Amino acid sequence: MATTNGNRKILDLKRWEFCTPVPTATVAGAFVASSRHYRQQQLYVSSATVHHLYNPLEDAWVQIPSGALAGTFAVGACGTSTSVGPSGTATAGTTSTITTNLTLARDLRGYSIHITGGGANNGVTLPILSNTVGTNSVITVATQASAFTASTTYRLLTPRWYVLNAITASGTTTAAVFRFYDFALNTWTSAETGATDGIAPAAVIGTDSKLIATPSWVGSDYKAFATGTATAGGASTLTNSAKTWTTNQWANYQVRIVSGTGAGQIRTISSNTGTVLTTSAAWTTQPDATSVYNIEGNDDFIYYLGSNAVTLYRYSISGGTWTTLSPTAARAAAPGVGMSAHWVYEATDAAWTNESDIRNGRFIYSFRGTAGAVLDRYDIALNTWASALTYAPSTEVFGAGSKYVYRKDWIYAQKDATGRWFRYNVVTNEQDGWSTMTYTQGAAIAGDTAFDVHYKDGATTIDYVYMLLNTSTVLLRAQVV
């Protein structure tokens, strides 16, 4: 029987429930990063060596291998999750199996595999029905019309968490500060950064800071901001003559060829006119009038902001490089302790989903924390900041101990260690009270340990906000009514 959500405002009050406590208490710098995949695992990093995954399906924690992070675990440590795990070229295949050179560590059924090239089945994204565990893992999918071969290239749509540890003094450490945990492989790896693996974007990582990914896959499917069929293509262009896009609104998104000529290819969009996308790298196979495409969040980019500075950095996963961005308008002032940063990608208002002037997927919203009751917004497409957005009532200052969650039209914020929750509406630019947790917290500490989980049954979605309390092992959750 389908689930029906009968909760109504006023009639049904929000109530905070106790969940399974975390095995290690929250400390300064501890944070939670959500996978945003269908199992909705949450990575809790409580030190340079101790990390746990929370499984909301079972309300339970499990320790994972040590990340052995260099640096000093402290305020400023942060993390994010991308939607793409390991990739490679098959060593053999049939119409329903792909033999990989990967050493998969766990059952991945329910996750998906995207075929990026190699001939047959290019562009398809298939649920994983089963897989072997161990060396040269074999992945089984639904039977296809053509066989996979040793030329088939693929990427697994499985969680990968990127973690950046704090650096308390310039020059004290470089390597292994920036690492990622691959869920499919159950391994930690220093992120590629050129001459020295695992280096940080800035000389000092501290005060408070955030890593922000912009994944194409959210939950159990791609998050497409636009889709269509090309009318033509060039060496590094894709044309859809029926469109009326605003100039450069798609810059720094990605375009993926879903089917037709060139299927499986993914490129970063460098610019656009009303009808033409220009990519940052040439196509291997030029699209044509048969090419069906999606425009999505960019799987290659991770943004870093914080450390009591206005400087904004961007990491390229494929290139293994940090870039210091030079926004047209710089952020007016540095964020402090209690800052936030959220990529807004699922606002429901028509103005945000309008393909001709897209807003979803375009902005990173950031409260400045102790730097004041101020909210700034970074425009990913135009590489510019809008500082001190007007919103009402802009009175609450979020300091040490503040925690944040983004979901749909709302950014939820718990102030300091007070238990008082607020919500900001990205569509209407309003903030109001949302809830209060009456359970007493410990000392307020920097580090974001709130997250969201949603229950979905057909057309019904029920959202929950979770929070690990300050200096505590207590985990609470409340249903969004």
Report each predicted region and the residues it spans.
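Kelch-like beta-propeller repeat domains
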Residues: 1-85, 103-107, 148-224, 246, ...
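Autoprocessing Asn-cyclization modules and mimics
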Residues: 66-69, 79-150, 155-157, 171, ...
